[in-house]
A protein has these predicted regions:
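ALDH superfamily catalytic-core signature
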Residues: 229-372, 435
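Residue-level signal for inorganic ion chemistry
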Residues: 30, 66, 88, 111, ...
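Conserved C-terminal structural/oligomerization subdomain of aldehyde/semialdehyde dehydrogenase
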Residues: 29-35, 219, 256, 309, ...
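Long amphipathic alpha-helix in the N-terminal Rossmann-like dinucleotide-binding domain
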Residues: 49, 71-82, 96-121
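Short, well-ordered beta-strand elements within core beta-sheets of diverse protein domains
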Residues: 32-39, 54-60, 145, 255-257, ...
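Short, solvent-exposed loop/turn elements at beta->coil junctions and helix N-caps
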Residues: 129-133, 350-356, 439
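Rossmann-like NAD(P) dinucleotide-binding subdomain of oxidoreductase/dehydrogenase enzymes
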Residues: 122-264, 392
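Short, structured beta/alpha segment
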Residues: 1-90, 263
Length: 476
C-alpha cells in the first residue's frame, strides 16, 4: 500500500499535526491501495501562514520569472507524463488509454495554453490616450483551491497554473478519494523549483479542510469545483470574510438532435455521455430527439450503448471503467431504479453488474426512453453512464425543455442548418454550447450559468479570476 500521509507545506513534505489516516480505494476492486492523512485546522493554518508569507515576495516577481518556472514545470510534466496517467487510472478507475490520452493530456494542454496566454497578457495599461488614468492588474493574494475527483489533473491545472501565473500563492486540497495525482503534481512543482510557500497541499475532506479553507480569514479567494450542494456551503463559509469565490458546479446537459443532424449524431452523443463513465459535469445526459426521427434514434442509441464495453482500468482499449466510489455507485443505482419506478422505459443497461465483473463499482451504459422532464432521471445530476431520451416536435419546445433545469453548464445541439444552430445556441442558457460534436479549444472560457456556478476557467478569463483591478489617477 502506498504511504502518502504527508502534506506539502512551505517547500517540504511534512507530517500532519494530528494523525488521521484515510484509505484510498481502487474502484476497480474495492480494495485500498494507498493511505493519506486527513488534515486538521492546524494543518490548514500552517499552509495558509506559509502561503501568506510567500505572497509578500512572490507578488513582486516579474512575468518573465513566472514564465520561466511554468516552462520548467511543463518540462517536468512531460517527463513524468506516464506517472500521472498511472496515478489517475489507479485512483479513479479510468482505463489507461483514457487516463493517458485524455485525462493526463488535458492537464498538459491547460498548462501550455496558460503559458501562451501569460506571454501576451499585460498587467498594466493606460486607460486611453485622452486620460491620465492607468490600470493595474494585481494578484488577489492567497488562494484556496479545492478540486474534484472526476477530472483531477484537468481541474488542478485550471486552478493552480493561473494562480502561479498571476503572482498568487495557494493551498490546494485535492479530492480525498482521488488525491494521488495532486500529490504527484506537487512533486513536479517542487522539482521545477518554485519558491517555498508559493504552493502548498493539504489533503482532507470537505467538512474539515474544505471548511477551514473557505472560511479562513487569511485566504483571499476560493476556487472550487464539485457538487452544487457543496458549492452552496463554500459560498456561505466565504461570505463571512467577503472573499472572492469561483465555482464550477453540477450540470444537466441537454443534447438537441434535430431531424437534419449529421449521420452519426446520435451515436456520437452516446459515446460522449458514456465517456469517463458518465462522470463529467457537462455530460449531455438528456438527449432530445425530433419526433420524426425518434424511433430510428432510439434504435441507434441502444445499439451504440450495447457496443460500449465495461472493463478493468488496467486494460488497454476504448472501454469505460467503474465509477469512483460506493457512494456514487449507490446514488446512480438508486436513480436508475427511480427511472424504472416512475414509468420510463429501460431500453439498455440497468442496475445489474456487467457480465464478468462481480467486484468493483461498474455500471452498464444505461438508456431510458419515454422520459418526461418531470422525472428524477431528467432533473437530477446522475454522474454516471445514464442517458434519458426525450422526444420533441418544435425548436421552441426543445429549447424550453433543455432550459427547464436549475443548471446551466454545457448544452449540445446537432443540425446541419448553420442558421438554426446559431439561433438555438443563443437561446440555450449555459456557459458552453457544443455544435455538431465540436469540442472546446484550450484557452476558451469554461463555466456555468445559474446553479452550475460562477466565474470562468481557462485562457485569459482564467487568469483574470485571480486578479484585482486597480485604477491610478494623475498618471501623466
Amino acid at each position: 500500500m502506498l504511504d502518502k500521509r504527508k502534506f506539502y507545506i512551505n517547500g517540504q513534505w511534512v507530517d500532519p499535526v494530528k494523525k488521521n489516516d484515510f484509505e484510498v480505494i481502487n474502484p476497480c476492486n474495492e480494495d485500498p491501495f494507498a493511505v493519506i492523512s486527513l488534515g486538521s485546522k492546524e494543518d490548514t493554518d500552517l499552509a495558509v501562514k506559509s502561503a501568506k508569507n510567500a505572497f509578500e515576495t512572490w507578488k513582486e516577481t516579474s512575468k518573465e520569472e513566472r514564465l520561466s518556472l511554468l516552462e520548467k514545470l511543463s518540462s517536468v510534466y512531460k517527463k513524468r507524463f506516464n506517472e500521472m496517467a498511472e496515478a489517475i487510472s489507479l485512483e479513479m478507475g479510468a482505463p489507461m488509454d483514457w487516463a493517458t490520452d485524455v485525462q493526463t493530456a488535458s492537464g498538459k494542454d491547460h498548462l501550455d495554453d496558460f503559458i501562451l496566454r501569460l506571454k501576451n497578457f499585460k498587467f498594466d495599461e493606460h486607460f486611453d490616450n485622452k486620460s491620465n488614468n492607468h490600470i493595474y492588474y494585481e494578484p488577489i493574494g492567497v488562494c484556496g483551491l479545492i478540486t474534484p475527483w472526476n477530472w483531477p489533473i484537468n481541474q488542478i491545472a485550471l486552478k493552480v497554473v493561473p494562480a502561479f501565473a498571476t503572482g498568487c500563492t495557494m493551498i490546494l486540497k485535492p479530492s480525498e478519494i482521488a488525491p494521488i495525482s495532486g500529490m504527484l503534481f506537487a512533486e513536479m512543482i517542487d522539482e521545477a523549483g518554485f519558491p517555498k510557500g508559493v504552493f502548498n497541499l493539504v489533503n482532507g475532506d470537505g467538512a474539515g479542510v474544505g471548511t477551514h479553507i473557505s472560511s479562513h480569514p487569511d485566504i483571499d479567494m476560493v476556487s472550487f469545483t464539485g457538487s452544487t450542494r457543496a458549492g452552496r456551503l463554500i459560498s456561505k463559509n466565504a461570505a463571512e470574510t467577503i472573499k472572492r469565490v469561483c465555482l464550477e458546479l453540477g450540470g444537466k446537459g441537454g443534447n438537441i438532435v434535430f431531424a437534419d443532424s449529421y449521420k452519426d449524431a446520435v451515436r456520437d452523443g452516446i459515446r460522449n455521455v458514456m465517456s469517463n463513465s458518465g462522470q463529467s459535469c457537462d455530460a449531455p445526459t438528456r438527449m432530445l430527439v425530433e419526433k420524426s426521427i425518434y424511433e430510428r434514434a432510439v434504435k441507434e442509441a441502444v445499439d451504440e450503448a450495447n457496443k460500449i464495453k465495461v472493463d478493468q482500468a488496467s486494460k488497454k482499449g476504448d472501454h469505460i471503467g467503474p465509477v469512483i466510489s460506493k457512494i456514487q455507485y449507490d446514488k446512480i443505482i438508486d436513480l436508475i431504479e427511480s427511472g424504472i419506478s416512475e414509468g420510463a422505459t429501460l431500453a439498455a443497461g440497468g442496475p445489474e453488474l456487467p457480465n464478468g465483473l462481480n467486484k468493483g463499482y461498474f455500471i452498464k451504459p444505461t438508456i431510458f426512453t419515454d422520459v418526461t422532464n418531470e422525472m428524477r432521471i431528467a432533473k437530477e445530476e446522475i454522474f454516471g453512464p445514464v442517458l434519458s431520451i426525450i422526444p420533441f416536435e418544435t425548436e421552441d419546445e426543445a429549447v424550453n425543455i433543455v432550459n427547464d433545469t436549475s443548471y446551466g453548464l454545457g448544452n449540445y445541439l446537432q443540425t446541419e442548418d448553420r442558421e438554426k444552430a446559431h439561433r438555438v445556441a443563443k437561446k440555450l442558457r449555459s456557459g458552453c454550447v457544443y455544435i455538431n460534436g465540436n469540442g472546446a479549444d484550450a484557452g476558451t472560457p469554461f463555466g456555468g450559468y445559474r446553479q452550475s456556478g460562477n466565474g470562468r476557467e481557462g485562457g485569459v478569463w482564467g487568469l483574470e479570476e485571480y486578479l484585482e483591478v486597480k485604477n491610478v489617477t494623475g498618471w501623466s
